[in-house]
Amino acid sequence: MAKQPKRITAWTGDRDAAHSVEAAIALVKANAKAKFDETIEISVNLGVDPRHADQQVRGVVNLPSGTGRDVRVAVFAKDAKAAEATAAGAEHVGADDLYEKIAGGFMDFDRVIATPDMMALVGRLGKVLGPRGLMPNPKVGTVTPNVAQAVKDAKGGAVEFRVEKAGIVHAGIGKASFTDEALAINVKALIEALNRSKPSGAKGVFIKRVGLSSTMGPGFKVDISSIGA
């Protein structure tokens, strides 16, 4: 049998037991040994079947401790709204000109925001933005006349979440360099947002399992009673 890489054999902590959120965070951080500031990621198994329209889960949460990411924002807007977006810190602002850039392959951004009147234009980029999860949507606040606030939210810790086919939500909730307390606050904020987004068709236990991991490290189970789930 081939030897496991040293990075794997060096992992510490019980991966089978369910830990309090504080203990799980400490274990994840202790195993985040890459030479870069690893993202701390959460996975939440939900008691839903996303194949049914009344069991979809989608929303946005403003993480109190931020994300630790430098979020690059593109905004489709004109005139005064374009000026507001630029003043709020958006990296790329435009209308037809921005459409042409993206249609030509430009993708140097992490979030797309649009004013409602721009959606007819933005909709033509569906095949480009949709598969990447970048299509603006009013349900998560990225189609809005208040582009300045949307830009500030995106850069200040707003994280979109959406249930995947297997009934799982994945999200980044900070960096390994964050304090344990800051990460715990973000975890609890996301869980609260998920509970608020519980669909009408969900029956039985909604939040079934929660796990935490880092970009390059192992995952650890979280005792859901420790996060009020």
UniProtKB/Swiss-Prot annotation:
Any Gene Ontology biological process: regulation of translation
Pfam families with a match to the protein in the record: Ribosomal_L1 (PF00687)
Name of the gene encoding the protein in the UniProt record: rplA
Subunit structure: Part of the 50S ribosomal subunit.
Keyword annotations from UniProtKB, A to Z: Repressor, Ribonucleoprotein, Ribosomal protein, RNA-binding, rRNA-binding, Translation regulation, tRNA-binding
One GO term describing the cellular component: cytosolic large ribosomal subunit
NCBIfam families in the cross-refs: rplA_bact
The keyword Ribosomal protein is annotated on this UniProt entry: yes
InterPro entries found in the cross-reference section: Ribosom_uL1_bac-type (IPR005878), Ribosomal_uL1 (IPR002143), Ribosomal_uL1-like (IPR023674), Ribosomal_uL1/biogenesis (IPR028364), Ribosomal_uL1_3-a/b-sand (IPR016095), Ribosomal_uL1_CS (IPR023673)
Entry keyword annotation includes Acyltransferase: no
Function: Binds directly to 23S rRNA. The L1 stalk is quite mobile in the ribosome, and is involved in E site tRNA release. Protein L1 is also a translational repressor protein, it controls the translation of the L11 operon by binding to its mRNA.
Gene3D superfamilies: 3.30.190.20, 3.40.50.790
Any GO molecular function: rRNA binding
Annotated protein name in UniProt: Large ribosomal subunit protein uL1
Protein family: Belongs to the universal ribosomal protein uL1 family.
